[in-house]
Amino acid sequence: LNTVNEIQELCTRFNKQQVVYISMGFGNPYGDPYDLGIVEKFTDILVTLQVPIIALADTIGVAQPNQIESLFKSLIRKFPAVEFGAHLHSNPMTSLAKIEAAFNSGCQRFDGAI
């Protein structure tokens, strides 16, 4: 987090916006504890550091639409000044449902690859 803070100070000085990704924002494949509270805790820390854009990453593609909806609704309500983004890994069968869940929950920033 010290590095995030240093980068944020540079961004502020040079009129840039830092984007920080919360990897494994929807689950942890290594058996470590995971829940909404952990994501909220790190989001709160990033907000304290004045990070303006936070992207939630489904690094391993395990997020379900209801989980995506719940997380974005909760975070957007608690941190209205933050621009939240989604970095979702998926397959053609589940991608639309995941994107719609994030969008319908207030997320308006999406990463994509072609």
PLM region spans:
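Alpha/beta enzyme core
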Residues: 1-18, 24-86, 93-105
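Beta-strand segments within the central parallel beta-sheet cores of soluble alpha/beta enzyme folds
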Residues: 85-89, 113-114
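Glycine-rich phosphate-binding active-site loops on the catalytic face of alpha/beta enzymes
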Residues: 58, 107-114
